[in-house]
């Protein structure tokens, strides 16, 4: 208390809720005022908390009177704030007293805490008083609009360019080139298509937004002491993390192990995090590599927590440049890092030696079995030796139930049993701190030593069943995880993508658990890549899409699902509609319109409960109400015949709701509902998880049709996201300040083209299927519909693109151009269209943050991919639709991190593919056409330089787009394969002969001919 005041009197006003407990009239205050020691003990405090007034006020028998202040001034230094001029109204200055003293004042009580704690009677467990006071409600996230100074000119330029394109096309149609109608007709058709495709691509970009998450508010709301959570235990929902892999030789197990380690060490409540790996190949190599990773995680995860390591992928951490001690405060960091680095090197040696170890073990044990069989055969058993198979053996001396090194019936890649192995059990619900002496080399005192649960899964595969590639594996993981952990949210990763920002998951939860988050089906993170060449020759970073298109879609109904780094709401994956108290309508999907509650009742259940969730939820009557509102919850024809799985659906829906801590939260759960510990796994639960990943489980169900990942397309990710948007769900694009996740991308030209081919083929499949956006429901917003329509249409642009790339060559060969003359009107329109395009590019760079070089690389690879992979995708898609020929793709090989002298060796490796032929043809034809055009103009008596200028500039512009392709074919130091020269020569000879045949030379130099 300030030294300015010698004494004071606290008197309470006679409010209706502050009346004397007896019938006695209010007593006057004593002359000396109310002292803290004179007040009675609080009715709910301990003996040491005697500094709190009685339940309804201070004074004798709770007398209530006007609050007054009696003070005596004491001289004080002029710098003391308490000497400020007092209010002349005579009212009590509440703020002043709250500032000057440590007392807490209110109607009916005053509190002097000791050391800012309450309830500490010497036995510990003290709780701060402010923790027991209800905190003001805070949003967990907010939208950050693009500044109008950027967005308004951007939209205006889109309108200007649209008008310019319209006028240009009108002029082109009304001014044909009568000397070359065929050339004019081809160009007109191409230009109309380009204008249409530009409109489809540009319109969804009109409303880009940014978002920001408040991690401090998330911690305060879910992990801080409160009246409903006095101990501050985490109230966050559970999260199931999926890792997908299929071939340990194309996807190195060391890469997968590093991904697993980064997930196990992420910053999320350990008891709420559950990690699964789906090994679709059923390989023992993957199984034993994950076992090695789990053993190393026992020291790696506590090390990351102790020293706040970033990133938590050990390979990326130890290979990153810079000072590793920067920002580290603990004196033992250098010693710990040196020891853990040595342990990681030994871990890598063990993992890399596993293939040889497994094979040597198999050879030794198979030799033993054959010896025993020969002994039995010698004893009279004639069939003993014939029954011995070349098995693959586990470390405990038993047969591996998955795929063997030498495939045999029931042990082949497409024919093996289900495997579920919980390698790390559920951690203890309470924090388990390390102690001095727990580890011989690391001091883990006061470090949480727990590790999240981890399970290895390999679904059953049998001949005669369609396994539906990655989508089938994801659905198997969804069902198994629902039985084992049933986290209401799921995060999926490819095996080569790892967590680069350990706070990224928390940022995603800010959106899912915020007000209105129950209508969000998934949070998509941008894909970031490492190991890309500095010039990004083949646009691997794809920043134009991830930072431009996807950010713009976030302002509509949400970004598309792009395969990895996506956090899902489990309930949305199950095919249910979102809770719909309002409908979003309008061009941008921002207009809120209330709807009939009966229309949205099917997706707004009351509550749920059950064993699988492990949380405190509603009773049996709530489950019965939920089942009544959701007849599909118990429909085996939709979800299968697992009763345990069906019961888990209501629990997952309930636990995924936001907190009911604000009147505007219409579909929430009470705070503190997820504080109870989870029951341990038992044998029956694990057996049920094995059952739901059997190959027959999906028979006569809607898995892959309306439930889970959707089957029937090689781009199952886009289709799955489209289905959820089509039901009215929204999605969010989460761009974190530090990259959330990182992965690898193919830097080899052939691998990159095959990757683009797979994506484009999936888009063609979407276009010819019922997932075409033209057939979408009215819940899909207009501009979002245009974006999905563009996904299905963009490969067809290749048909027009390759014709347009050949137009300059045809112009130079024929001596004509797409217009009769280079009319000023034509040049003006062309200039206006080009200028508006460049201005749009500059503004897009401004609001998206991409660089001009990245934009130009994207344009170049759009032409390269459009005339190769996209063209092949259209042909393959048409063959599938017309002839029913199925399309299969090989798994893209992931490069393991190695200490190589040249990290970009793959960039210079040339692997011939038929996809090279169309771009080679375009390049060769344009070069020959340039030579022909220049020769004709030079040797003509009346040179027509305008036609040469138009065709020549056009041809140079085409060749500029193919520069990365040509550079890639050169290899390194002239190591171009012979087949490239062969094809280039064949194309040149063919084009030359074709031109001579179509336009034979004559003696008329005046007509532009060349004397021969």
From Swiss-Prot:
Spans through the membrane: 150-170, 180-200, 799-819, 825-845, 871-891, 914-934, 948-968, 978-998
Catalytic residues (positions): 280, 717
Membrane topology summary: Multi-pass membrane protein
Keywords: Cell wall biogenesis/degradation, Glycosyltransferase, Golgi apparatus, Membrane, Transferase, Transmembrane, Transmembrane helix
Any Pfam family hit: Cellulose_synt
Low complexity bias: start-end ranges: 20-37
Bias-annotated ranges (Gly residues): 606-618
Catalytic activity, EC: 2.4.1.-
GO process annotations (BP): cell wall organization; cellulose biosynthetic process; plant-type cell wall organization or biogenesis
Primary role: Thought to be a Golgi-localized beta-glycan synthase that polymerize the backbones of noncellulosic polysaccharides (hemicelluloses) of plant cell wall.
Family that this chain belongs to: Belongs to the glycosyltransferase 2 family. Plant cellulose synthase-like D subfamily.
Protein name according to UniProt: Putative cellulose synthase-like protein D5
Species of provenance: Oryza sativa subsp. indica
Lineage: Eukaryota, Viridiplantae, Streptophyta, Embryophyta, Tracheophyta
